[in-house]
Amino acid sequence: APLTSEEILQTPNAVHIPETIGSVVPAYNLPVEGLKLTGPILGDIFLGKITKWNDPKIQSINSGLSLPADDIVVVHRSDGSGTTFVWTDYLSNVSSGWEQQIGKGKSVEWPVGVGAPGNEGVANSINTTPNSIGYVELAYAITTGMKHAAVQNQAGNFIQASINATKAAVAVAAPSLPAGDQPQSWTNVTVVNAPGADS
C-alpha cells in the first residue's frame, strides 16, 4: 500500500519506490469452472447484500453454469495487509455502496464473513469451506491451483487474471505515474479496474 498522508508527514525525506506489482483475484470453492463476476456483484457479496450463489444477478451472467442455492461464505483477511488494501481499493472503485460504507485500507471493518491470517490462511479457509469466496494474490492462486473468477473490466470483457492482464493494466497506467521523489503524489495512485480491453 502507498504511504498515507500522515506517514509522509512523519518521514518528509522519504522516496517512494514501488518494488512489485501484482493482481488480487476472487478465489472460490464451488463445483463449477469458469465463474464470471462483475465489480458491483463482488461489492454486494462482500457487503452481504448478495447471499446466495444462485442469486439472479450472478446467474444472469453465468447462464451456462448450474450454481447452487447455497449461502455464500465470504472469507477475508484477519490481519492488515497490502492484499486487503488492493482488494478494498478495487471494491471502492467499482461499488459506490462499498466506497460509502467501508472504503479502502490495509484493514477494514468487514460487514460479513470469516477472517483468516495471510494469503495462506485465506486460501486454506476457501479450500476447506464449500461455497466460499475470498481474495488472494494471483501468484498464490496459481501456485496452489485455486479456482478464481473472471471479472468484467471497464470495456465490458470478462478477464481471467493473468500475468498478461496485469501487464496490460500497468502499460495503461505507466505514462501517468509520478516520480519516486514525490511520495505525496503516490498516495492515491492505483491501477485497479484499469481501462483497456485486456486489463
For each feature predicted by the language model, list its residue ranges.
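Second-shell loop/turn segments in exported
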Residues: 12-14, 28-33, 71-77, 109-113
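N-terminal segment of the mature folded domain
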Residues: 1-61, 66-67, 123-127, 133-144, ...
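Ligand-binding clefts/hinges and TM-proximal coupling segments of bilobed small-molecule sensing domains
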Residues: 49-75, 181-199
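Alpha-helix boundary/capping residues
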Residues: 49, 90-94, 129
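Short amphipathic alpha-helical coupling segments at ligand-binding clamshell hinges
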Residues: 37-41, 83, 178, 199
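Ligand-binding cleft/hinge of the Venus flytrap
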Residues: 58-111
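Flexible, solvent-exposed loop/hinge segments that line or gate ligand/substrate-binding clefts
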Residues: 1-7, 17-19, 100-199
